[in-house]
């Protein structure tokens, strides 16, 4: 189980990303628009830099919903591989069966 502080930090990042998502997308679009002047694009980059560091979606980490494990997490389920195996064998995940051939 991951430490609670790490999980809380992730939740805080999620909230910041959601809060600044619109601004981040606008500045990003301006900065990457080659039809704009160089000054406008440079200004947009400066504004992007002024946003909080954790407002950038690339700083988010996928974690297991049960254990908080940061690695080996399947996006489709939001669970770590060990928990998927555990729940699948117990029959708690619909549609998952053990492979046999």
UniProtKB/Swiss-Prot annotation:
Pfam family, one: Ribosomal_S14
Transmembrane intervals: none
GO cellular component terms attached to this protein's record: cytoplasm; small ribosomal subunit
Family: Belongs to the universal ribosomal protein uS14 family.
Domain of life: Bacteria
UniProt subunit comment: Part of the 30S ribosomal subunit. Contacts proteins S3 and S10.
Function: Binds 16S rRNA, required for the assembly of 30S particles and may also be responsible for determining the conformation of the 16S rRNA at the A site.
Lineage: Bacteria, Pseudomonadati, Pseudomonadota, Betaproteobacteria, Burkholderiales
Keywords tagged on the record: Ribonucleoprotein, Ribosomal protein, RNA-binding, rRNA-binding
GO MF annotations in UniProt: rRNA binding; structural constituent of ribosome
GO biological process annotation, one example: translation
Protein name as it appears in the record: Small ribosomal subunit protein uS14
């Amino acid at each position: 189980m991951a430490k609670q502080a790490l999980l809380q930090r992730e939740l805080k990042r999620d909230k910041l990303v959601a809060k600044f998502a619109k601004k981040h997308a606008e500045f990003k679009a301006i900065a990457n628009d080659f039809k704009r002047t160089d000054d406008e694009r440079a200004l947009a980059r400066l504004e992007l830099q002024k946003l909080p560091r954790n407002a950038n979606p690339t700083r988010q980490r996928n974690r297991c919903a049960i254990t908080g494990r940061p690695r080996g997490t399947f996006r489709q389920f939001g669970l770590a591989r060990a928990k998927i195996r555990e729940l699948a064998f117990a029959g708690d995940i619909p549609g998952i069966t053990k492979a046999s051939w």
